[in-house]
Amino acid sequence: MADYQRILSYLYRYEKSEKKECLGFIKAEQKSAILKLTIQINDERLLHGMELKLCFYEKQGEHWRVRKLDSIITEENKEEFHQMYSKEQLPEGFDIKKQSGVVLYYQEEYYYGS
């Protein structure tokens, strides 16, 4: 299990960079270059058909690098998302243990983040 890595983090709602309440969690597990994601969000503001842009971010020197992984189309205000990604579906050089967190954007100034 030496190649197994996991991130488990709460997801908070952000409005104009201000951290609000905790509304869910993300669990990301990577083993043998396969990434398994579990995301749960319970937010009454989450409407049917909203697009959430799923991005991971990491610190690289003085800068932050944001990598978009996927887009999620919501079905209801209690969203539960399970997905697996092969090495070919991941951004080049993606390594879960190097990631600092995750962001799910739905508008420029409104998002969920760890």
Which residue stretches match the model-derived regions?
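N-terminal targeting/export leaders
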Residues: M1-S114
